[in-house]
Curated annotation (Swiss-Prot):
A Pfam family annotated for this UniProt entry: SRF-TF
Biological source species: Sinapis alba (White mustard)
Protein encoded by which gene: AP1
Name this protein carries in UniProt: Floral homeotic protein APETALA 1
Gene Ontology cellular-component terms listed: nucleus
Record-linked SUPFAM superfamilies: SRF-like
Length: 254
């Protein structure tokens, strides 16, 4: 007796429904992978659970490319079937297409941030890890390149500053040398001009023959002249020519 055909209907038990969903989902993903490998086909599988969780499978993680290809194909097919379709319908389709693309990008962003990873299979996690490793390699390579460029720029500036300092030091030394030479020349010229003349030969004179001019001096009574030293000397010796002069006159008179 053959096996009877099982009627398909919704499983009322929540736990049984969840277990069945997990088993069938794994089988469906396995079948999709097998057909993509055996037949060299591009497969894209999208499944939403009753809680709204997304489960997907794509050949070589090319979900975006497959969806874009599907949209182009379906859009071209619709244009051939109904070339005179309403413009509003086209705008609605474009809106739905862009909305689906935005949702896909947001989901990928959450995956890159380590969120909503429960619904991903081991292969999807492995592909995500490879993408992150590749991104990290590019980031580190760019960072090392920037650091290398910064170091080269600092070394170039340091070399330029050293050359400038060397040039300034050389100019300062040359300037100091010129100033020392000018100072030595100036000292030699000043030494030659400021030498005192040799003293004149001394003449021996009698003390009484030295000319002496009376010098005025100020006294409380008025202005007086200093007394002549010769007169002072004559008075000190109490010598006078007046008696001799009178005597000679008397002799001539007699």
């Amino acid at each position: 007796m053959g096996r009877g055909r099982v009627q398909l209907k919704r499983i009322e038990n929540k736990i049984n429904r969840q277990v069945t969903f997990s088993k069938r989902r794994a089988g469906l993903l396995k079948k999709a992978h097998e057909i993509s490998v055996l037949c060299d086909a591009e497969v894209a599988l999208v499944v939403f659970s009753h809680k709204g969780k997304l489960f997907e499978y794509s050949t070589d993680s090319c979900m975006e490319k497959i969806l874009e290809r599907y949209e182009r194909y379906s859009y071209a097919e619709r244009q051939l079937i109904a070339p005179e379709s309403d413009v509003n319908t086209n705008w609605s389709m474009e809106y739905n297409r862009l909305k689906a693309k935005i949702e896909l990008l947001e989901r990928n962003q959450r995956h890159y941030l380590g969120e909503d990873l429960q619904a991903m299979s081991s292969k999807e996690l492995q592909n995500l890890e490879q993408q992150l490793d590749t991104a990290l390699k590019h980031i580190r390579s760019r960072k090392n390149q920037l650091m290398h460029d910064s170091i080269n720029e600092l070394q170039r500036k340091e070399k330029a500053i050293q050359e400038q300092n060397s040039m300034l030091s050389k100019q300062i030394k040359e300037r100091e040398k010129i100033l020392r030479a000018q100072q030595e020349q100036w000292d030699q010229q000043n030494h030659g001009h400021n030498m005192p003349p040799p003293p004149p030969p001394q003449q021996i004179q009698h003390p009484y023959m030295l000319s002496h001019q009376p010098s005025p001096f100020l006294n409380m009574g008025g202005l007086y002249q200093e007394e002549d030293p010769m007169e002072m000397r004559r008075n000190d010796l109490d010598l006078s020519l007046e008696p001799v002069y009178n005597c000679n006159l008397g002799c001539f008179a007699a």
